[in-house]
């Protein structure tokens, strides 16, 4: 056990020395603190029923955006892009949505509005994605993509 602790301590020391050299004399505590800040976000899952409804709305908005096998035809939409957007808007009013579900709905709405070239509602939808992230956890990728899209649209 002592040997294992010694080896672990040696490895930490060597890593610390390498980090000090590579980061220009940054303290080990600063490097470790930075590493602690980048913890994985544990976002809540999307329910299967909501996922199916979102997929149906996405097919209405843009059937070509649905992943499929090579040569497989695009799925047949059961409504117009406007119907898909309305379906998503109705889903955002559900009270039992978690932050991840709500942010994913707004992200898909942003896609729908962008497809229809409705820039003001696209911007509003991306802002709602970020607002959902203030209430609960959303994925870091979704947050960054929303910020990037807002930057490009403004």
Predicted regions located by residue number:
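Aromatic-residue detector
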Residues: 1-3, 110, 129
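Bacterial N-terminal signal peptides that target proteins for export
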Residues: 2-17
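Charge-rich, low-complexity amphipathic helices
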Residues: 11, 127-128
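N-terminal leader/linker segments that initiate helical-solenoid repeat arrays
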Residues: 19, 25-127, 134-145
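Register position in tetratricopeptide repeats
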Residues: 115, 152-154
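Short, surface-exposed, charge-dense and proline/glycine-enriched linear segments
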Residues: 131-134, 152
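Alpha-helical adaptor scaffolds
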Residues: 145-151
């Amino acid at each position: 056990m002592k040997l294992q602790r010694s080896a672990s301590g040696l490895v930490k020391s060597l890593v610390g020395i390498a980090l000090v050299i590579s980061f220009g004399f940054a303290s080990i505590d600063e490097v470790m603190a930075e590493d602690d800040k980048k913890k994985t976000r544990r976002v809540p899952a999307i329910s299967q029923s909501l996922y199916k409804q979102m997929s149906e709305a996405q097919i209405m908005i843009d059937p070509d955006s649905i992943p499929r096998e090579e040569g497989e035809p695009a799925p047949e939409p059961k409504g117009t892009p406007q119907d898909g957007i309305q379906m998503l808007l109705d889903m955002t009013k559900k009270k039992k949505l978690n932050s991840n579900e709500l942010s994913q709905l707004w992200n898909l709405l942003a896609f729908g509005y962008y497809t229809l070239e409705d820039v003001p509602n696209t911007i509003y939808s991306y802002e709602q994605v970020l607002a959902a992230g203030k209430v609960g956890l959303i994925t870091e990728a979704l947050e960054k993509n929303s910020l990037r899209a807002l930057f490009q649209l403004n």
